[in-house]
């Protein structure tokens, strides 16, 4: 016997005019997350989720497409002004910032929060190609 469907309130759209865009650009992928000022996720996208696989995920074009998708979803929730936090050494940093700017957001600030070790863990060995 099929379960009866639960009838409840529909999820109401929250209007979040000011938010923060977090861009995490690694060597293999780029992840863009839009949050409100308290850090609750509003929308996100990544190069892999946008349909890119393998080494194409690490390209600037993939980061641009992912940033555009995340920005569009954030704008549906009423976001108009963003601050941008950039983390990581990846190649998608600049293009993701440009895509967010081109999506029509008013950019309040851009801050680089890449963690820099004070001689912490040993880095991976150099590649020999």
Swiss-Prot record:
GO MF term (any one): structural constituent of ribosome
KW Translocase (keyword) present: no
InterPro entries: Ribosomal_uS11, Ribosomal_uS11_bac-type, Ribosomal_uS11_CS, Ribosomal_uS11_sf
UniProt xrefs under Pfam families: Ribosomal_S11 (PF00411)
Cleavable signal peptide: none
Matching SUPFAM superfamilies: Translational machinery components
Membership in a protein family: Belongs to the universal ribosomal protein uS11 family.
Entry-linked HAMAP family: Ribosomal_uS11 (MF_01310)
Described function: Located on the platform of the 30S subunit, it bridges several disparate RNA helices of the 16S rRNA. Forms part of the Shine-Dalgarno cleft in the 70S ribosome.
Protein name: Small ribosomal subunit protein uS11
Gene: rpsK
């Amino acid at each position: 016997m099929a379960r009866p469907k639960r009838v409840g309130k529909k999820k109401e759209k929250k209007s979040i005019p000011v938010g923060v865009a977090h861009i995490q650009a690694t060597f293999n992928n780029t992840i863009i997350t839009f949050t409100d000022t308290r850090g609750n996720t509003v929308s996100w996208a990544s190069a892999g989720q946008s349909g890119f696989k393998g080494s194409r995920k690490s390209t600037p074009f993939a980061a641009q497409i992912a940033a555009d998708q995340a920005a569009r979803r954030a704008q549906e929730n009423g976001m108009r002004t963003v601050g941008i936090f950039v983390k990581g050494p990846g190649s998608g940093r600049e293009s993701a910032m440009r895509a967010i700017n081109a999506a029509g957001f008013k950019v309040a600030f851009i801050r680089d929060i890449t963690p820099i070790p004070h001689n912490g863990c040993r880095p991976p060995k150099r590649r020999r190609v």
